């Protein structure tokens, strides 16, 4: 009997792929975690029924969110990755000898463990001596940070469920405070067909923050 995995994009559209094997299916305190194998994409990770990444194409995301800001900023030494349980972004960052510290803040410890077991080619990035992994809520972590980071990469998942707090005005304000004056922040913004429930949320919060900071004399 064939096994298929389907990811709903809208009520009328879904992506389906034939599954060769299911390697893992567990429930953490935060979400359901599945690792499956397909002929088309190899191993892939799904959280609450939505594909996070696959062996075939994860490099596209990890390289884009890493190397573009690194090419723009002249002197990155301290980096914060919010999320990043799979280690893919950290794996790209450790190639830069100028970086002195990489803090990875991920609330779901089980997700880190699953990724270490099934995606060691990615989580090797978490084993570098410069990388510190904190199993903690990112918003709480950020509240005590002021001017600590040259680069913040928001590698969290969609703005629903347990990560919803990472897509609020308070969160972006905390990120802004944690950045140095010339710091850069990179964040995920979904494709339109995936973002029906949050199209109004992210831009409004960011724009409000930018307007407030301009009025306070910081650009």
PLM segments and residue spans:
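N-terminal auxiliary segments of SAM/dcSAM-dependent transferases
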Residues: 1-44
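Ordered hydrophobic segments in well-structured contexts
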Residues: 6, 44, 184, 218-219
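Substrate-binding/catalytic lobe of Class I Rossmann-like enzymes that use SAM or dcSAM, i.e.
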Residues: 190-219
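Generic structural "secondary-structure junction" signal
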Residues: 7-10, 21, 25, 54, ...
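Short strand-turn-strand beta-turns centered on an Asx-Gly dipeptide
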Residues: 48-49
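Residues at the C-termini of beta-strands that transition into short coil/loop
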Residues: 39, 137, 218
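The AdoMet/dcAdoMet-binding core of the Class I SAM-like
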Residues: 2-4, 53-187, 193-200
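A short linear-motif detector with a strong N-terminal bias
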Residues: 11-16, 23-25, 57-61, 82-83, ...
């Amino acid at each position: 009997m064939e096994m298929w995995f389907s990811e709903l994009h809208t009520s009328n559209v879904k992506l389906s792929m034939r599954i060769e094997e299911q390697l893992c299916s567990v429930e953490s305190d935060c979400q359901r975690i599945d690792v499956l194998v397909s002929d088309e994409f190899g191993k892939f990770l799904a959280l609450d029924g939505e594909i996070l990444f696959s062996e075939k194409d994860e490099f596209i995301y990890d390289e884009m969110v890493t190397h573009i800001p690194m090419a723009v900023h002249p002197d990155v030494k301290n980096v914060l990755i919010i999320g990043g349980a799979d280690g893919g972004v950290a794996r790209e960052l450790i190639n830069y000898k100028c970086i002195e510290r990489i803090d990875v803040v991920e609330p779901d410890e089980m997700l880190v463990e699953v990724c270490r077991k099934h995606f060691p080619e990615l989580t090797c990035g978490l084993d570098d001596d410069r990388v510190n992994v904190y199993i903690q809520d990112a918003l709480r972590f950020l509240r005590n940070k002021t001017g600590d980071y040259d680069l913040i990469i928001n590698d969290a998942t969609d703005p629903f469920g347990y990560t919803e707090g990472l897509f609020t005005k308070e969160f972006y304000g905390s990120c802004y405070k944690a950045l140095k004056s010339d710091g850069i922040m990179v964040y995920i913004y979904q494709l339109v067909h995936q973002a029906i429930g949050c199209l109004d949320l992210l831009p409004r919060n960011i724009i409000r923050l930018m307007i407030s900071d301009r009025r306070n004399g910081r650009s």
